[in-house]
Amino acid sequence: MSEIGAATNLLLPIHEMQWNRWYYEREKLRLFSSFVLLGTSGAITAAEGALDTQYGNTYGIRIELFNYPHALPKVYPKGWTIQPEVAHRFTDGSICIMRSDQWRKHFSVALVVAKTAIWLNKYEIWKRNGHRWPGLEQKH
């Protein structure tokens, strides 16, 4: 299994996970000013926002937080469609930012946004270079 590297400012130390996790999640998410946490009935269920790429395009993103932080969040395009032939997406239409076995409960929603930004920039390169995914790849 390959471990995911992450900037420490996108991780949650134990005291932040145990105390008021959503307070710290909001603080870390401020690094991505267009993103907000959404909820119903007092529970946080998703995050939404938009990311700009190196080519000047903006992509809407919805992050579903089912069973968060114990399971990898699902990242979906919002207001656009992933080209169907791209390899790095799941069958449910969500974006593959990492494998579920790489997810750790100290990862934050902000880390998911950062990994999504990397995916989007690679996606734009993929669209321009004859559909070859740039960089290293992993099996799903």
Residue spans for each PLM region:
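UBC/E2-like fold recognition across ubiquitin and ubiquitin-like conjugation systems
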Residues: M1-G60, P69-H140
